[in-house]
Every structure is written in structure tokens, then in C-alpha cells.
A protein has these predicted regions:
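Conserved, mostly hydrophobic/aromatic
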Residues: 28, 55, 63, 97, ...
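Short, acidic/polar
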Residues: 42-57, 313-324, 384-392, 529
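Aromatic-lined substrate-binding rim segments of carbohydrate-active enzymes
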Residues: 48-129, 292-293, 297, 546
Length: 696
């Protein structure tokens, strides 16, 4: 059950605000989720109105702001919220936004980052041993961050949650009167980029005593009995004489079980314990967000939808969107990318997964942070990078975004509005983009993806536990376009192939084959299996030889409905925890072809070529190669918007078959027009740019 379904079964949203596919419905009116970030506490209060007017002039409908705990706290449990310091008067800031017709997305943390020292947490919290995450050796877990490193909090720590709840209680009396319909706040974000503060290696953390207790409860709930757990792990019973006396408690009671501290698997079934630990991290984060959400409600901040933002590289972190969706209403992504071919592929992969999940849940695919500028310790991101990223994300299914940052502030370079509310040239692009989205009714359009590449959660957990670079986050490798092949150990555990690598290679081979022919597809996470497979004509499932029975059943059901199912590069001989199957899967339920193995790139190319004809798949091929096209349709199925993406450093003329997209197109940003000749639409493309074209 998702958070939205849970609300539907109870009192739901009590303030006439709810999420819908096109955005956020407020008192019956659908408002597209187009927002801009403004940090009031970093600006002169006398400039707030000018800054917010400039945000509205860019065509944005909401203002997004953090409410930093450390900035407002003057003593434990006591906040300064404008009584003596006008710069911290959140009420006045929100009321100005309301006067201007802007709604507010409030982000009270407790973790906010925002390039603040300690990520916006009070210094007393991060240096409190009871609040600190713990390493396997029970040391604080340090984050090497500018201006200096600090110990990160534990998402399991009761002391930390008690302190966060006290902060919310102090904040509640000021924020509650600002909630819609009495004020402009219509959306709350819970925490921020909750990837364990970027110390997200499988064996980095969290060995805090409260986390160990929660881990044992997680195992007890999952297995029910210690005998079931012992059977799963292949652990002998005490009377079999094979267990050292020092460890016999571990096989007789949950309360004595300790988590793994390093990867020590020697055979496939040894992985079960490690995969459980990786899954526990996902459970820990979802549980923490749920606790924080309940603390907000207890402080009077209730009746509104909630969000959480996943950081770049989220697929390599313990953030499991399918689980986070059970405790918050909208899971979005943060985008900070360069304009280049690698980023284009990453954006396509991330956004297609987000869009497919969001569509299935009837919520908008939302970028909680769409980078406009960069912090000074980041690789520079210029205006071309920002324009490329947002247009590319829209091309692959994004339906709303928050311009981060809309207004300049300290520790940020390149926002479209300066700190006095004066628009810079970059603001013109965002204003034109907002107008283009409104003109086309883009929030109501849909990009169809009849092909789904399914990545079982087992594969992502396996890549985490087999990560080869210690505390250097797997997310870093994902951000730069590297996969399991570049970051995982090549152990085969006796199976004769590198266990964590080949499924990733398989998925990427199909991505490349599909894109070469312009076939629209989406990536789907394995735990979205119950919501994101229904309308697919072709399911491609990557597996290293392990598959959950529940996932196999979903694939078989899809096959029974008429979809084609392709699995590979290995036959699934294990369940999702690499335990031998008691009864082998009946692969005949998936079709007659069997697993696709052998020369995967060649086989993928042949399979795609065959499927285009046999499954009547759309193909928006574009000449020359390396140029990508996506099409967005209205409710009647008519193509309305065409994106042409040139991630290369070449100035080229892209040629698109006009049969699928019409004979005339106009660029919604620079007003260029194009007309098909001899059945081909020719579009001039500058290097590393994206065109958004209205079709006629």
C-alpha cells in the first residue's frame, strides 16, 4: 500500500490539496508543479518581494524553500522565527508569496544540505554521540564535506528522532497557520536526499545500537522464526556441532544476531545474509521518513501531501523508491548534469523509471531540484548544461520541476535571478520554457513506452554488497555513467561468471539496441513490478541468475496477457536471495525462446530488430546516429510535442521521418520553424542542445 492509498483509506488530505498526474490539485484547480527555490534566510528581507516577483515572472507557480533547523535554533527546543530577526521571519516570507499568488513548498528537514555547514543540523546534534551513525568498529561515520568533515546522524537513533520531533514541535505553531487554505503552503518535503548522508556503502554504516535493534526486528518480521532464518542462511543448528560456542546464540534467537561487517560470501547462498543487510538499509530509510512524517503531523503540520527527493546516482544507494512511496506521497529526483552523451543516457534512464512509476501512481513525475547553477565546490554547470538537462528530462517524461536555485545566494553560482530580484539573461530561458509548457498543456501529455527494461532489486542490492571501492559511494560511479562493471568486484562465488556485472551489461546492451532504432522504452525497478508492467508489450528482465518468485509470477502473468518476455543473460536458478530454488521455475510460462545468453550485444540487436515488426513497436529513428527523438501525445493519441536531443559536440542537421510526427514543427523556445520535405523533417541542431518542437 502506498502513502496515498493509505490516506485514501482514512481521512486523506484534509485541506483540499492532492497530487494528480498533471501536478497538484488545489481546491479543484490543477496547478502544474513548476517551482523555484528561494532561501529567505540568506537574503535581505527588504528584497524578498522583488525576488518572489521575479520568480513569478519566470512563469513559476510555486516557491520552494528550506526551513533550516540550525539557522532558526537559538537554544535546544527554542527557535527564532522572526520575533527579533527579520531575516528569519518565515511567516512574512510566506505571506508575501501568498500576496503574489505563489504557493509554497516547505522543506523543514531535518537534513537539508543546501551547502550549509552540518547540512543545516545544529552543531550540538552532529556532535552528540547518541545521535551519530556508527561504523562496524563503533566509530562515528565522518562525511568529508566542505568547509570541514562532520559525523553524520543515524537515521535509526531514537535520540536523533526525539530531537527532530522537538524541533518540529517548536516550528509547528508558526507553520500551521500558513498551511492551505489559511496560507500558501501546499506541500511538505520530508528530509532531503536521504542516502545515509552519502556514506551509503553497504558496510559503511549503520551499526548504531538503535539500528542493530531495528535490524533484528526487521529480520523477525521477515522470517517469523529463527528456524526459518537459519534455513535461509544455511546455518547449521547448535546440535549439529558445527557452530562455535561464541556464535550459538545467533542461531537460537533473533536478539543475538549481528549484521555482516564486510563481504565474506564464498558461495551463492552466503549472499542471503548480505542481501538482507542491504535490504535493511532500504527499510531503515523508509522507516525513518515515516517517523519524521508522523512527527510533522504530531506538531500540527498535517493534511498536505508529502515528498522526498532522491539524489543523482540514486540507483546505487539504499533509497528504494518503491518503499519510500509507501510512506511519502511523491518521490522525485534531483538533477545536476552536464550537457554530454553520458549525461543524456543517465537522464533517460533515471527519468523513464521515474515517469513510469509516477504514471502508475497517478502523480506527476517531478524534479524536486532541477539544477540552475552550481555550488562552488561542484564541477561548473553553465546555462547550456541547465537548459540541456531540463529539456532532456522533459523529453523522457518529466512533468514538473523546481528550479534550484531560482534566486542567487551564498555558496551558489549561476542562478537566473540575483539576490536583489533582478533577472539575469538566464531567466529568459526559464520564462520561455514555462510558457511552452503552458501553451502545449505539457503536464497533460504522455510519452508511451511499450518496452520496459526491468532491473530486479536483487541486482541493485548485489551491486551494493559487491562494491569494490569501500567508502567511495557507488552513487559517484553512477553519476559519471559507470555501472557494475566499473565498480564491483568480479567474484563468481563458484558460478563461473562475475556475479554482479553481467546483468548490468545485459540491460545496457538492450538500451543501446533500442535507442539505435529509436524504440521508446523505460527502465523499471523490480519492486515496482505490481504497478509498472501492465501496459508493456515487451518486458526485458536482467538477471544474474537470481529472481524472486513474485517477480517471476508477474512476468508470467504479463506473458499470459500477450506481452513478450525476455530474460538473461542467465537462467534464474536461485530465488531473490541466491538460495537454490526448491522447485525450478517453469520457464515455459515466459515463452518458447528461453533465456537470452551468449553474445548479448548481437543477440539484443537481433531481438530488437525482430520485435519492431512482430510487436508493432514505434520507432523514431533519427539520422545521423547519436541523435535521439521522443514523442509526447495527447489523450487522443495525437503527437503534440517532439524533442530532438543532440548530446554531441557537432553542429548537425537531424533528419526525422515525418510520417510519425507530422509535417510542420515550431521550436517553442527560439521560435524556429521546420517543414518536412520528401517525408523527412530536417532540424538544425547546435552542439549539446535539445529542441522542444510543437507539432502541426
Amino acid at each position: 500500500m502506498t502513502a496515498r492509498e493509505d490516506r485514501a483509506g482514512g481521512e486523506g488530505f484534509g485541506r483540499r490539496v492532492r497530487l494528480v498526474p498533471g501536478g497538484i490539485e488545489i481546491a479543484g484547480d490543477v496547478v502544474p508543479l513548476l517551482a523555484g527555490s528561494v532561501h529567505y534566510w540568506r537574503l535581505d528581507p527588504n528584497e524578498w518581494r522583488a525576488c518572489l516577483e521575479a520568480v513569478k515572472a519566470m512563469g513559476l507557480r510555486l516557491v520552494d524553500t528550506y526551513i533550516p533547523w540550525a539557522v532558526h535554533e537559538v537554544a535546544p527546543g527554542k527557535l527564532e522565527l522572526g520575533a527579533s530577526d527579520p531575516q528569519r521571519d518565515i511567516t512574512r516570507f510566506c505571506r508575501i508569496a501568498e500576496e503574489l499568488g505563489l504557493y509554497v513548498i516547505a522543506r523543514p528537514g531535518p537534513h537539508i544540505n543546501a551547502e550549509l555547514t552540518y547540512f543545516g543540523l545544529p552543531e550540538r546534534i552532529v556532535w552528540d554521540p547518541a545521535c551519530q551513525a556508527r561504523s562496524p568498529d563503533q566509530n562515528p561515520v565522518m562525511l568529508p564535506m566542505l568547509p570541514f568533515a562532520f559525523p553524520v546522524p543515524s537515521y535509526a537513533s531514537d535520540a536523533f528522532h526525539d530531537e527532530a520531533a522537538r524541533y518540529f514541535q517548536a516550528l509547528g505553531p508558526v507553520l500551521t497557520p500558513l498551511l492551505y487554505p489559511n496560507g500558501p503552503i501546499v506541500l511538505f518535503q520530508i528530509d532531503n536526499e536521504g542516502a545515509l548522508y552519502f556514506r551509503d556503502g553497504a558496510y559503511d554504516q549503520d551499526y548504531h545500537p538503535d539500528a542493530i535493534r531495528l535490524y533484528r526486528e526487521f529480520l523477525r518480521e521477515k522470517y517469523g522464526t529463527i528456524d526459518a532464518l537459519r534455513a535461509s542462511y544455511g546455518t547449521p543448528t547448535p546440535d549439529e556441532g558445527e557452530v562455535p560456542s561464541s556464535r550459538r546464540g545467533e542461531v537460537t534467537r533473533f536478539s543475538a544476531i549481528d549484521p555482516p561487517r564486510k563481504l565474506d560470501a564464498e558461495r551463492p547462498r552466503d549472499l542471503a545474509r548480505h542481501l538482507d543487510w542491504s535490504e535493511f538499509h532500504e527499510h531503515l530509510l523508509a522507516t525513518a521518513f515515516q517517523r519524521l512524517g508522523r512527527a510533522l503531523v504530531a506538531a500540527g503540520m498535517d493534511g498536505l501531501p508529502t515528498t522526498h527527493n532522491l539524489p543523482p546516482g540514486q540507483d546505487a544507494t539504499p533509497l528504494n523508491a518503491a518503499r519510500v512511496t509507501k510512506v511519502v506521497d511523491l518521490v522525485g529526483l534531483d538533477y545536476y548534469h552536464m550537457a554530454d552523451p553520458t549525461s543524456r543516457a543517465i537522464i533517460a534512464r533515471r527519468t523513464s523509471e521515474l515517469a513510469t512509476r509516477s504514471e502508475a501512481l497517478s502523480v506527476p513525475a517531478f524534479a524536486c531540484e532541477m539544477g540552475a547553477g552550481f555550488p562552488p565546490f561542484f564541477p561548473p554547470l553553465d546555462e547550456r548544461d541547465g537548459a540541456f538537462t531540463v529539456l532532456c528530462a522533459l523529453a523522457y517524461g518529466l512533468r514538473g520541476f523546481n528550479v534550484y536555485m531560482a534566486v542567487e545566494r551564498d555558496r551558489w553560482i549561476g542562478a537566473p535571478i540575483d539576490r536583489h530580484g533582478r533577472a539575469r539573461p538566464y531567466a529568459v530561458f526559464w520564462r520561455k520554457l514555462s510558457a511552452a509548457l503552458e501553451q502545449t498543456g505539457f503536464h497533460e501529455l504522455r510519452r508511451k513506452t511499450p518496452v520496459r527494461i526491468l532491473i530486479p532489486r536483487t541486482e541493485r542490492r548485489l551491486a551494493r554488497v559487491m562494491h569494490a571501492f569501500g567508502p567511495l559511494s557507488g552513487a559517484f560511479f553512477s553519476i559519471v555513467g559507470a555501472g557494475a562493471r566499473e565498480r564491483c568486484v568480479e567474484d563468481d562465488l563458484g558460478l563461473g561468471y562475475p556475479l554482479a556485472i553481467e546483468a548490468d551489461n545485459f540491460a545496457r546492451a538492450f538500451e543501446q539496441a533500442l535507442e539505435a532504432r529509436g524504440v521508446p522504452f523505460a527502465v523499471v525497478g523490480g519492486e515496482d513490478r505490481d504497478i509498472a508492467l501492465g501496459d508493456a508489450r515487451w518486458l526485458i528482465c536482467a538477471t544474474s541468475g537470481a529472481l524472486k518468485p513474485e517477480l517471476f509470477d508477474r512476468l508470467a502473468e504479463a506473458r499470459a496477457r500477450g506481452a513478450r518476455v525476455t530474460i538473461g543473460p542467465h537462467e534464474p536458478r536461485f530465488d531473490g536471495a541466491f538460495r537454490p530454488l526448491s522447485v525450478p521455475f517453469d520457464l515455459g510460462r515466459l515463452g518458447e525462446d528461453g533465456p537470452l545468453t551468449g553474445d548479448v550485444p548481437a543477440a539484443a540487436d537481433a531481438a530488437v530488430s525482430n520485435a519492431i515488426g512482430s510487436l508493432d513497436l514505434p520507432a523514431y529513428a533519427c539520422d545521423p546516429g547519436g541523435i535521439y527523438v521522443t514523442v509526447h501525445e495527447d489523450a487522443a493519441g495525437a503527437p503534440r510535442v517532439l524533442f530532438v536531443v543532440n548530446p554531441s559536440d557537432r553542429d548537425i542537421v537531424a533528419r526525422v521521418s515525418a510520417g510519425a510526427v507530422g509535417t510542420k514543427a515550431s521550436d517553442l523556445i527560439d521560435d524556429s520553424t521546420f517543414e518536412a520535405r520528401a517525408g523527412t523533417l530536417e532540424v538544425r541542431m547546435k552542439p549539446r542542445t535539445v529542441r522542444m518542437l510543437a507539432l502541426r
